Each structure stands twice: as C-alpha cells, then as structure tokens.
Amino acid sequence: MSSAVPRSGFVVFCVLLVVTLALYPVLRTLGVQIYSAFTGKYVSGYHSLLLVNCPTEQTARDIGRIIMEKRLAACVNIFPRTATMYYWKGEIRDATEILLLVRTKTSLVQRLMTYITAIHPYDIPEIITFPINDGSQHYLKWIAEAVTDS
C-alpha cells in the first residue's frame, strides 16, 4: 500500500512535467505579452529577422508571397542583385542573388525555415536569423498582429 502512494505521486509529477513542457511556448508567449502590456517595454528576442538569398527575383517574389499568404511573415523586403561569393564543391563561385529580408515572430522561425527550405530551389538555401533586440513599439506590435501562430 505504501508503495502505491509514491508511485501515483511520481505519475502525477510526470504528467505535470509533460503538460508544462507541452504548454511552454504558449505560456512563454502569454507571459511576454502580459509583461509587455504592464510595463510598456519590449521583450528582446520576441521578433526575428531572416535573411534568405534566392537565385532570381521571381523566386524571391514567389517565396515572399507564399510566406506572406501563409501569415508566417509580416513583411518581406526584396533587395535586387546582391553580389555573392561562396565556396561550393571545393571552388570559389561568384553569383548574383536576390536577398529577402523577412520579419516575423521568433516563435515562427523554425516553421518558416522548414517551409522555405522545402520550396527553395537551392540544395542548401541560405537562411540566417537574428533576434530583434528593440524597435518601434507600434511596428513590433504590428508584426505580432500580422502573423499567426496557428
């Protein structure tokens, strides 16, 4: 009988741990929003920038439009004709690429990178992310409203 009590306590502990870990992203997002609402301060890293190089302007426009339609990004800038040098298969190569600058919530970065990798024509697409440390509160709020976590 005494061994049943500790065992059930352990099961309850494990269930609580699993539920807490499963809900962590939601709880963190909620905590950040509450903190920001009460203090009026931005929480560093809640939003991110992604840099994505594309081989053509049409590819960049297609990727940009698709991620916007899926509401994975709030805004995409397309910078035409960036000169690029890189190592590929033991050689230094020169190319002209189109740079996408994407703004989103950090909670969507992994999903966005997975999606871009799946539709990008490169074998190894260049996708680099940076957390946004600060910025216009109104703009950052707009980013959060423009994208969806679902």
From Swiss-Prot:
SUPFAM superfamilies: GlnB-like (SSF54913). InterPro entries: Ion_tolerance_CutA, N-reg_PII-like_a/b, N-reg_PII/ATP_PRibTrfase_C. Keywords: Signal. GO terms for biological process: response to metal ion. It comes from the Eukaryota. GO terms for molecular function: copper ion binding. Gene3D superfamilies: 3.30.70.120. Transmembrane segments: none annotated. Residues 1-31 form the signal peptide. Belongs to the CutA family. Homotrimer. This is Protein CutA homolog. It comes from Danio rerio (Zebrafish).
